[in-house]
Amino acid sequence: MIDHIAFWQAPKVLETLKLQALGKPVAMLLGHPSSRYQKKDLLFIDNWEPDSVTELKVVLLAPYATINLIRDFQIEKKIKPELPEIVEELMLCPNPRCITHSEEVPHKIRTKEGRLPFECYYCEFRYSHDQVKFL
């Protein structure tokens, strides 16, 4: 289960991570009351355990998300993915004038001390999680 997704962002997370391609049952809860965020979304994926790249993608799309591994209707493990300071070869810079769109250079994105906003390593274009596009 992916918990603490920003309100109305679960469809984007589901589509971007291609979770429906897993062939597992998926349930989406939109606008669930939250004491911390007022409203939040959740994704329930039956019998799912993400790899490290998927965990990183989750935190890039939903910075406050928690991944809960559920077995026999109990939370077995909570994973709070953290943003590294540099993300390489995973995300595209949204700036159309960035060198990464015309030259063969590695795609690199900086996070300031593991926080938002993201910043392109080359053009220093700053953007937030709602502008993330993966390679």
Across the structure, where does each feature detected by a protein language model lie?
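Interaction interfaces in information-processing and related assembly proteins
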Residues: 1-79
